[in-house]
Amino acid sequence: MLQLKSIPPAGAAGAMSEPAHITVRGLNKEFNGSVVYDNFDLDIPRGRFVTVFGPNGCGKSTLINLISGLIPTDGGEILFGGKRLSQVKIGYVFQNYREALFPWMSAFTNIEYPLELMKVPKKERVERVQRLVDHLGVRIDLTLYPYQMSGGQQQLVSILRALVVEPEVLFLDEPFSALDYEMSLFMRDQLQRIFHETRTTTVLVSHDLEEAVYLADYVLLLTRRPARIADYRYIELPRHRGDETLAHPDFIEHKRHCLEVFQREVRRQ
């Protein structure tokens, strides 16, 4: 198992005592001559919920796409508890649920599809999906097809599909951006419950600062390109979080601080 030197996240109080699950060192990436990441380092603690926030075009989605192997790096090293990506299972929830689910498959079949690709026998696939659904207390009709379901239900199916392989890490790329506000609130609650039950290391990209602070154990704030860590804010708020969290003085202070960092980066030339 490979080991890389731990780098305490700047501004993340208490992070030094937490073992890194994802270790990024010397990450490089450019598109058409534009440098997105240049010798970028990052540690993500095990079993924590990390949200990624920053200016438009700074490379938020690119970061999780690089870490998850969806796009190749131009250099650097990424390890998962000392292991290479090929040695770990990951789950990924895409931004557009309408394009992520297969419309000719029922919700249940969509969820079990990754297990079919892994050559898991049918009986075991059914058992694993049912066990996951029961464990998380999901109350939707999985015999329905995606086009028969609400947006939130479709995105929940996408999340279940990502979780059915029992991933070490779950990545979510702006999973609520295509949902209306009411459904976004519902899905925040669902995702919190899933995280509480599984304690899967979770990395979520968000364009909504309130959402980023509300869901996170840590908020990773990025600078403009080439992206650096502007701050890595530890959000010390009790879970389960609800409407009362939004009015809590500590939440308001965390959000104010993150907004200040964000605005500073937006104004930076």
Predicted features by range, described:
Residues 53-55:
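The feature captures the beta-strand-to-loop junction immediately N-terminal to the Walker
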Residues 76-88:
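Conserved ABC transporter NBD signature motif
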Residues 145-149, 153:
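Conserved ABC ATPase signature
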Residues 68:
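Helix-to-loop junction immediately C-terminal to a conserved catalytic motif
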Residues 116, 123-141, 193:
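Conserved ABC ATPase "signature" region
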Residues 164-168:
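A short, proline-enriched helix->beta-strand linker immediately N-terminal to the Walker B motif
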